[in-house]
């Protein structure tokens, strides 16, 4: 990249470009030149690779050719969307001066910076996903973390105590862009994340952060927001807010508060649990067959985003949960009438953010008008229901009749995409605008009359009057009749088969029309800006309305799902335990073609651990996950897939289910498994729900069994957590004999010959066998391998017959115990078959059979 050190050697235009580029050295600069945004030097090379556009040259400056790439201004949003998805940031530099009045290069300045975490344009956002900007800070006392959704104004802060909690927050929020300080020491936490931005340490200063936030909120202190005593979170929030202001280059009036999120307010889930439960993303990274995909019947994008936030942060406040349940119950008979109204409301939340940023387009305001038009009917519908649960939401949604009437008067029915296209403001809204438009719109009548008059006067049947953007108005005559035009016809353009002329009368009219069009467009832009000034004083009430409408959408969607899938209202109890009758897995039951086998679950103070045995593919993991998902659904206020459910207090959900190598961190499958297990043993409490699936598989049989045994003992005796413990170690089925509160259950299966039928039903007691060979045969393992495995199994079972392997809590026993002496084997060894008569051989067979 050419620097600003030798500016005088460059052309004036390149001097201007280099000065602007020096202010934004680390991001791409889109430099407006006419109908294109151009990129030069290294920016051009990068953009050509990232966007797959041509790399060319634009003359030379300072004696060197200038690499150049460009994109048309009318298609810039598509290119910006691609760059944002790649984690790139772009400075948009516009022409702000008048080219006609400029003696040198047209005046330009950077008007906005588009970054992955601060985009608000509809075309650049995924409509049903939050798009978060985040900042992280670390101190010896823990972490500070803040997130901002600039497309809604939602500003959150937290203080995770350790690296595991911080990792869980990063996974929950999944920021599009993450700001971190220069001296950040826990890079392993964030180095794999997208959109990393290294920031100087001074941007995280505590006093600067307090000043920034008080200035933004118009307050003297931050005690009202609950963040005054959270210095780590404040540092992160201060850096984040300053970055947002720097990139947006405008006021941010829609950011009116910051909320402190505290772990004790919700059910805590670590990163592994969120991943294993597939809440909003499946294990393959997609969104199909997730809990969100099943539960999301929202008809607005803002409702869909709210539901995903609820799923990632289930709450523990029983009163708040019961209010949601009451609302769902009240909405059940209203679904068919309410959802069409909410669908018309659209994504009001993001429209309001663009209004606050003064970047809302005409169609945004038209959609806002449609949303306002639904509110009277919606209020009537909710009022007729007379539900106390719905009354607060109805109040917050409100009505905006005056604003609706303003937009009905001000905007045409279907406005164009951009204000600069004209035709946004409705006729009758402003008298002067109507006058200028009448003058411009009268052009076609005038041109028709002029064409008829000149054609008749001159007798030229090929004469016609037209207009194009380059040459303006013209009179066109065919080449064959061009010698007949009068002397006052001045040639303007020569075509292959025609000549185009201008006459003084037409030139005068052209000036008048173009002036009127320009004045009409300028006035229209002014009136459009004034609409922002009329709407923005109501921003706080409008944002409150959007939040209430989004919640109504979520609750009506959950009501629709409860009605369609046969969910029941769970009872939230103060007593420890989980009791579910005929529970079903909410996702699996929608994927299966055959009926889902429902199963019960009972956990209580006296029944804290279930040791679950049964065959692979028998349904152990499904049963465990379904328990966690039903508990989680109950804690977002949803109805649940069961005949009856009573859910006691739950503070955390842990899952140690499945594992894979973490190659990026250099950790084996077993290391990943043990790390997750350690987290559970350190952090689980008596109110935690713990799912442990096949602990100890990744090491030797002795080590694995010992670890599984010790973990089960710790969870049952020391921690007393509510635990579902699936295992293939049958030695663990003796735990109920040794520990209080531990019970055996198993997934049933029927074996017939070499085939197996999975019953998927949970029964009391331990499984009789693991059916491993039958499952292997079902999976397509070659018959000769299965045959050899059966032979080897018989050998091993014979060798270990009558062994004491169930005493796994005693001394460690060898895997293959030494075989006991066999009388039949000794007798067989002593027989010489060559000297036996047939009668003697038959006698020996009977004797040997008797010895077995």
From Swiss-Prot:
Any single GO BP term: mismatch repair
Lineage, top ranks: Bacteria, Pseudomonadati, Pseudomonadota, Gammaproteobacteria, Enterobacterales
GO cellular component: cytosol
Protein name as it appears in the record: DNA mismatch repair protein MutS
Keyword Hydrolase: no
UniProt record similarity statement: Belongs to the DNA mismatch repair MutS family.
Record has Nucleotide-binding as a keyword: yes
Purpose: This protein is involved in the repair of mismatches in DNA. It is possible that it carries out the mismatch recognition step. This protein has a weak ATPase activity.
UniProt KW keywords: ATP-binding, DNA damage, DNA repair, DNA-binding, Nucleotide-binding
GO molecular function: ATP binding; ATP-dependent DNA damage sensor activity; damaged DNA binding; mismatched DNA binding
Stored HAMAP family: MutS
Pfam families xref list: MutS_I, MutS_II, MutS_III, MutS_IV, MutS_V
Residues annotated to bind ATP: 614-621
């Amino acid at each position: 990249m050419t620097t600003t050190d030798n500016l005088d050697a460059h052309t004036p235009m390149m001097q201007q470009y280099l000065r602007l580029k020096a202010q934004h050295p680390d991001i791409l600069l889109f430099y407006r030149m006419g109908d294109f945004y151009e990129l030069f030097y290294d920016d051009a090379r990068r953009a050509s690779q990232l966007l797959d556009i041509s790399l060319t040259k634009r003359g030379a400056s300072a004696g060197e050719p200038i690499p150049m790439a460009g994109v048309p201004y009318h298609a810039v949003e598509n290119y910006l969307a691609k760059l944002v998805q790649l984690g790139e940031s772009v400075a948009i530099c516009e022409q702000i001066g008048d080219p006609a009045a400029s003696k040198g290069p047209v005046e330009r300045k950077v008007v906005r910076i588009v970054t992955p975490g601060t985009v608000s344009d509809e075309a650049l956002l995924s409509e049903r996903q939050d798009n978060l900007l985040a900042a992280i800070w670390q101190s010896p006392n823990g972490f500070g973390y803040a997130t901002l959704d600039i497309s809604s104004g939602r500003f959150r802060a937290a203080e995770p105590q350790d690296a595991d909690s911080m990792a869980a927050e990063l996974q929950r929020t999944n920021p599009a862009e993450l700001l971190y300080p220069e001296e950040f020491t826990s890079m392993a936490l964030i180095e794999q994340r997208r959109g990393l931005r290294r920031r100087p340490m001074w941007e995280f200063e505590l006093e600067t952060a307090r000043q920034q936030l008080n200035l933004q909120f118009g307050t003297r202190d931050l005690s009202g927001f609950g963040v005054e005593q959270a210095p780590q979170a404040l540092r992160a929030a201060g850096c984040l807010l300053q970055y947002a202001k720097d990139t947006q280059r405008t006021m941010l009036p829609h950011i009116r508060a910051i909320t402190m999120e505290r772990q004790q307010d919700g059910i805590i889930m670590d990163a592994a649990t969120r991943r294993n439960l597939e809440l909003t993303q499946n294990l393959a990274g997609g969104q199909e067959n997730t809990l969100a995909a099943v539960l999301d019947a929202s008809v607005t994008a803002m409702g869909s985003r709210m539901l995903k936030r609820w799923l990632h942060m289930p709450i523990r406040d029983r009163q708040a949960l019961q209010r949601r349940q009451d609302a769902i119950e009240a909405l059940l008979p209203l679904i068919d009438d309410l959802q069409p109204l909410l669908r018309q409301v659209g994504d009001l939340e993001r429209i309001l953010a663009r209004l606050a940023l003064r970047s809302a387009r005409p169609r945004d305001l038209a959609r806002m008008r449609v949303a306002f038009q639904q509110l009277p009917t919606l209020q009537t519908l909710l009022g007729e229901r007379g539900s106390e649960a719905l009354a607060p939401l109805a109040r917050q949604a409100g009505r905006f009749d005056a604003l609706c009437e303003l937009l009905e008067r001000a905007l045409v029915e279907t406005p164009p995409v951009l204000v600069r296209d004209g035709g946004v403001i409705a006729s009758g809204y402003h008298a002067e605008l109507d006058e200028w438009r009448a003058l411009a719109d009268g052009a076609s009548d005038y041109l028709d009359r002029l064409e008829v008059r000149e054609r008749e006067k001159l007798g030229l049947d090929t004469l016609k009057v037209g207009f194009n953007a380059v040459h303006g108005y013209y009179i066109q005559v065919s080449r064959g009749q061009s010698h007949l035009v009068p002397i006052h016809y001045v040639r303007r353009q020569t075509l292959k088969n025609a000549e185009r002329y201008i006459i003084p009368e037409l030139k005068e009219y052209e000036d008048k029309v173009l002036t009127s069009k320009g004045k009409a467009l300028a006035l229209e832009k002014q009136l459009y800006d004034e609409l922002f000034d009329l709407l923005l004083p109501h921003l706080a009430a409008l944002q409150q309305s959007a939040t209430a409408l989004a919640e109504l959408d979520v609750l009506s969607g959950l009501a629709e799902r409860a009605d369609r899938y046969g969910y029941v209202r769970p009872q939230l109890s103060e007593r420890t335990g989980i009791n579910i009758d005929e529970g079903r897995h909410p996702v699996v039951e929608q994927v299966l073609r055959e009926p889902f086998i429902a199963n019960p679950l009972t956990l209580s103070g006296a029944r804290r651990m279930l040791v679950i045995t049964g065959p692979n593919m028998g349904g152990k993991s499904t049963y465990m996950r379904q328990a966690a998902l039903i508990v989680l659904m109950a804690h977002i206020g949803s109805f649940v897939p069961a005949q009856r459910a009573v859910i006691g207090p739950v503070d955390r959900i842990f899952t140690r289910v499945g594992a894979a190598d973490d190659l990026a961190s250099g950790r084996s499958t077993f290391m990943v498994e043990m790390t997750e297990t350690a987290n559970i043993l350190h952090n689980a409490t008596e109110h935690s729900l713990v799912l442990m699936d096949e602990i100890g598989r990744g090491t030797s049989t002795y080590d694995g069994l010992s670890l599984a045994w010790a973990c089960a003992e710790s969870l049952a005796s020391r921690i007393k957590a509510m635990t579902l413990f699936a295992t293939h170690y049958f030695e663990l089925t003796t735990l109920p004999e040794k520990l209080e509160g531990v019970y055996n259950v198993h997934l049933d299966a029927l074996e017939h010959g070499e085939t197996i039928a999975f019953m998927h039903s949970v029964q009391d007691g331990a499984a009789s066998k693991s059916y491993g060979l039958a499952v292997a045969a079902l999976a397509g393992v070659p018959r000769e391998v299965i045959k050899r495995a059966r032979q080897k199994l018989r050998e091993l079972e014979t060798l270990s017959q009558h062994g004491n392997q169930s005493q796994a809590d005693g001394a460690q026993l060898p895997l293959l115990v030494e075989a006991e002496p066999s009388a039949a084997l000794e007798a067989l060894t002593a027989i010489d078959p060559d000297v036996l008569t047939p009668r003697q051989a038959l006698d020996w067979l009977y004797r040997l059979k008797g010895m077995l």
